[in-house]
Each structure stands twice: as structure tokens, then as C-alpha cells.
From Swiss-Prot:
Xref: InterPro entries: DNA-bd_dom_put_sf, Lambda_DNA-bd_dom_sf
Protein known as: Probable excisionase
Single annotated GO MF: DNA binding
UniProt source species: Acyrthosiphon pisum secondary endosymbiont phage 1
Magnesium as UniProt keyword: no
């Protein structure tokens, strides 16, 4: 830890600006292990990230070289989520699927449903 602190450290905002990505993307890189970082106070979860310039350069080099062609094709072929066409699995059909599942899992009765607020007497085969 002291090794990192002795070098010139960068905040998350400064590191993101150097790399050319957003701060959220930089946080995701930290979670994925793409970039090495140190917390200002390692004993606190909410402690801010600290980066070195060397770690930023290494992360950029490694992130460019580790993407395979198939991953790049997947990234390029992603479609906008707000398309006009409703497909199975979207929010609209998910509601419909939940409703159908609820109907299938509902408790079934052999007889008609009875209201217990009326004075109707039940016949239990006596």
C-alpha cells in the first residue's frame, strides 16, 4: 500500500480523463479486475479509488489486446433497447408471461367459488 501511495496517485475522475472513459466505466473496470487500484482507506468500503498513471496505461494496453474479434462483433451488433418491434422476452410480453404463470399456479377448485358472506349452507355429503 505504501508503494502505491508514494507514487503520484490519481483520483477516479483524473484516471478516467487520462484513459478517455467515463468514471462509471472505470469503476466497472475495477470490479472486473481490468485495472489495478488501491483504496484510500482499505478498511472502508466507500473509500475512494486511487490509481497510478502506470496502472492506467497498462489497463488501456491490456483492454485493447484482450478483446477477441467475436467480442468486438457482439459489441457492434448490439441493438437499441427501445426498438419499435415487440419481441418475446421484452417488458410487455414479460407482464403477459407473469399473468399466464400466475393463472397456471393458482389454486384450482373443483366446485364453484363460494362467498362466505352469504347465508349459503355447505353440503359436505351428509
Amino acid at each position: 500500500m505504501r508503494n502505491v501511495m508514494n507514487k503520484a496517485t490519481l483520483t477516479r475522475q483524473e484516471a478516467a480523463k487520462i484513459i478517455g472513459i467515463s468514471e462509471d466505466t472505470l469503476s466497472n473496470w475495477c470490479k472486473l479486475g481490468i485495472i489495478s487500484y488501491q483504496r484510500k482507506n482499505p478498511y472502508k468500503k466507500k473509500s475512494p479509488y486511487l490509481f497510478t498513471k502506470e496502472a492506467c496505461i497498462e489497463a488501456v494496453k491490456n483492454s485493447i489486446n484482450t478483446l477477441s474479434e467475436s467480442e468486438i462483433d457482439v459489441i457492434r451488433s448490439k441493438k437499441c433497447q427501445s426498438s419499435n418491434v415487440v419481441k418475446f422476452g421484452t417488458a410487455v410480453t414479460q407482464h403477459r408471461a407473469e399473468k399466464e404463470l400466475r393463472n397456471h399456479l393458482a389454486q384450482r377448485t373443483k366446485n364453484k367459488l363460494r362467498s362466505y358472506t352469504t347465508n349459503e349452507e355447505l353440503n359436505y355429503g351428509e
